[in-house]
């Protein structure tokens, strides 16, 4: 897997997490712990994307 492939894979995962957060937030009784966990995952992925983009 090339560096650009890895970045694209991470971007796809980042979008997927954003969609999961949106779904959870719009539920009648959203689980804040789940939302926090998803946001942490999303931030870690964003940090990795930025780091990889600086090395590309």
Model-based region annotation:
Residues 1-56:
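Extended, charge-rich alpha-helical interface modules
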């Amino acid at each position: 897997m090339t560096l650009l492939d890895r970045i694209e894979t991470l971007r796809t995962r980042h979008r997927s997490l954003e969609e999961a957060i949106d779904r959870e937030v719009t539920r009648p009784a959203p689980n804040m712990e789940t939302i926090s966990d998803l946001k942490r995952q999303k931030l870690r992925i964003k940090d990795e994307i930025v780091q990889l983009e600086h090395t590309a």
